[in-house]
Curated annotation (Swiss-Prot):
It is a peripheral membrane protein. F-type ATPases have 2 components, CF(1) - the catalytic core - and CF(0) - the membrane proton channel. CF(1) has five subunits: alpha(3), beta(3), gamma(1), delta(1), epsilon(1). CF(0) has three main subunits: a(1), b(2) and c(9-12). The alpha and beta chains form an alternating ring which encloses part of the gamma chain. CF(1) is attached to CF(0) by a central stalk formed by the gamma and epsilon chains, while a peripheral stalk is formed by the delta and b chains. It is an enzyme of class 7 (translocase). NCBIfam families: atpA (TIGR00962), PRK13343.1 (NF009884). PROSITE patterns: ATPASE_ALPHA_BETA. Belongs to the ATPase alpha/beta chains family. This is ATP synthase subunit alpha. Produces ATP from ADP in the presence of a proton gradient across the membrane. The alpha chain is a regulatory subunit. It comes from the Bacteria. GO terms for molecular function: ADP binding; ATP binding; proton-transporting ATP synthase activity, rotational mechanism. ATP binds at residues 168-175. It comes from Mesomycoplasma hyopneumoniae (strain 232). CDD domains: ATP-synt_F1_alpha_C, ATP-synt_F1_alpha_N, F1-ATPase_alpha_CD. Its EC number is 7.1.2.2.
Amino acid sequence: MNKDINIAAIIKNEIENFEGKIQNHDIGKVIIVGDGVALVSGIEKVKFGELVEFENNVLGIALNLEQDLIGVVIMASENSVFQGSIVRRTKSVISITVGDQLLGRVVNALGIPIDGKAELDNSLKSAIFTNAPSIMDRKSVDRGLKTGILAIDSLVPIGKGQRELIIGDRQTGKTTIAIDAILNQKGKNVYCVYVAIGQKNSSVAQIVSLLEKKGAFEYTTVILAGASELSPLQYLAPYSGAAIAEYWMNKKKDVLIIYDDLSKHAIAYRTLSLLLRRPPGREAFPGDIFYQHSYLLERSAQLSNDKGGGSITALPIIETQAGDISAYIPTNVISITDGQIFLRDSLFNSGQKPAIDIGLSVSRVGSAAQTNLMKWASSSLKLNLAQYNELKAFAQFGSDLGPSSQLILDRGNKIYEILKQENQYPLTERQQIMLLILIRENLIDSLEQKSIPLFKSAFLKYCDSEPKFRDKIEKMDYNRVLEPNNLAGILKDITDFIEKFNLGNVF
């Protein structure tokens, strides 16, 4: 009897102390699902870009807001979502893990590690979609970002905070230039982010292996949305990379980010848009494809001193078809960026590597970031190459050329030999300036074209190993043009070296 009284008392106490907490969930139902996209009804208050959750904890992003249906891209296999599934609002936007813990890691577009290493601490997160810095939060580009590639650093220099497009046909060395730029940041306190969009997993694995071998992976993060990934993940990948880079920029760091490549990103977004039943435009791309790329690239900036002075330098890559830079996506990105490095397959196939077309390549703001010494040393280079290319076109018709014209042709051929550079072997600014002085002062005229590669190797070794000459070079002030006396001394040493080389006394 006492036992029954105790039970009754417990029940009575529970009833008296019961607090009914009502949880209000805004829910809807999946009407149609297929190809990674679900059309959902019933969650009218959802916001654009908001995360929604399906029954089995699968997440999606609301990208289409119509009167009766919401278009949601599914962030997992579509087989995990069924018609009639319940969908719930999360009232939050998609975010990604950020911080120094990402250095030396490979993650997917959602920030989940895919390199088999330790899990990440998810306490520090940042929204993937954020606004670009305002005009008042920026300042002019005034610091150079060295790629270690002579043709780029002298002719199309890149500054920290700049957006420089790398454009060309497939297999012309676009990714190679980007990776060389990452390798050259070693010891320069620049963090790097490499975003692979629609690339083969095997190719990205080779890049990661190379970065590890060269000691560059310790300051690099790789984001992979491979060719086998769903279109939503390929679409999100560059924005995830930008969010990771922005964290460091706001911490007063300099960041280099590579988008490889935005052509595949545009195709992924086109796929999503067509599945979401958006009206197609030119080349079947949606009307806001320009906005998607401008919104992404405007997040790269040189922040003002009041905002810490950090920077994001972006090197987006675009693949062209048969060298056609007048297609829709190439012209879009060219108009958004601060210049482009155009790679031509005919140059690549002829052995000119990097295969940069000097006439079509330009840097609109990077020259302001060059040191005065580099500006002086490279001042005549573009003119020499322009004269060479103009004369070369006439020479193809078999016209008789005078001695002065022949000299310009011979000099141009030798300059192109000097500009050839092996990948994975960046040059220091000091080495670049010495090679440019050879060209500026016409010292290469006394060399044979076929001996240029051997001479270049021997000359760079001489610059680093000859104590007296090295001391003269190291005393050069990069912010000032060479004084006549100092230049005369350097030119005498170079002339003596060339004479020894021509006599076969240099090995």
